[in-house]
Structures are given as C-alpha cells and as structure tokens.
Amino acid sequence: MPKSVSPNGRGTIWAWPSTMATKNDQWCRDNTIRPVLSMQAHSAPLGITFFNYSNSSTSADDCPDDGGFPKSMNGNAFIAFHGSWNRNPPTGYKVVRVPMGDNGNPTVDEAIDFFCHHDKSGSGAKWPNGFRPVDVVFDKCNRLLITSDGTGS
C-alpha cells in the first residue's frame, strides 16, 4: 500500500489495516478523501520538517552568505525517507522536497528528489556507506541538517 499525505479532519478515515480487503474501490472513492501526495510503499518516511526562513540578525561569522536556503523556499516540506529493507529494487534512502502552496497543499504531484544516491551498478537507492536518513531540521542559518542511523551521522 503506498504511503500518502492526506488532509486530516472530521470524516477522514485512518483505519488501515482494519478496512483492508473489506471495502471495494467504489466505496473508497465515495467515502474517503484522496491523498494530496503519494509516496512509494516501503520508502519509510520518518522525518518531516517545513522550511521556515530565518532572517537571523547573527553576525556573518555565524551564518555565511552562501550556505542557507533562500526565502523563496519558505514553507517547503522536506521529508527523510529511511528506505526499504524488504524490497528489490530498494527504495527510499533519500530526502525529498515538496513545494507547498499558500493553501498548505503540495504544488506538485510527486515529491522532488533532493538528496539521493543513484547507483549505476544495480543496487538502486542504497548508499554504499550505509547512509539511511532518519530526520531533517534547519539550523538558524537556514541550512538543512540530515541525521542517519546507518552511519551515525
């Protein structure tokens, strides 16, 4: 079953797996809210943060001019995909960006790969050093920090 991002609120159904195989496609179309964004099954989205531009008044020594994200990316979502352990080819093992509109919904149909590994030898998304993103956060200088439990980073 694909992962998804859906609006939450009155009348939404968050019952998987209790409704699995008990409802047909038509029932689902008539009684549920479609996700606004889908993600590959087994990609394991663990951490999500929304970029909140910081116009920090710190000195240039603290925040160099060439390292942070621009204000134009304010509100974008960044999601850490921990990655699959049980599928071939592997999926996940990356950080994606989801541009968000003023209404709080994604402005794209699919998340945009932001930090990922593309291996030409056939091992897929896995990083050779074991890197597996867990969470993402921005520092006061608008730089994205990524944690990994595969490398201790």
Place the predicted regions along the sequence by residue:
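Blade-level signature of beta-propeller repeat domains, shared across WD40, Kelch, NHL, RCC1
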Residues: V137-S153
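Short glycine-rich, acidic/polar surface loops and turns
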Residues: P133-D135
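Beta-propeller domain segments
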Residues: M1-W127, F131, C141, S153
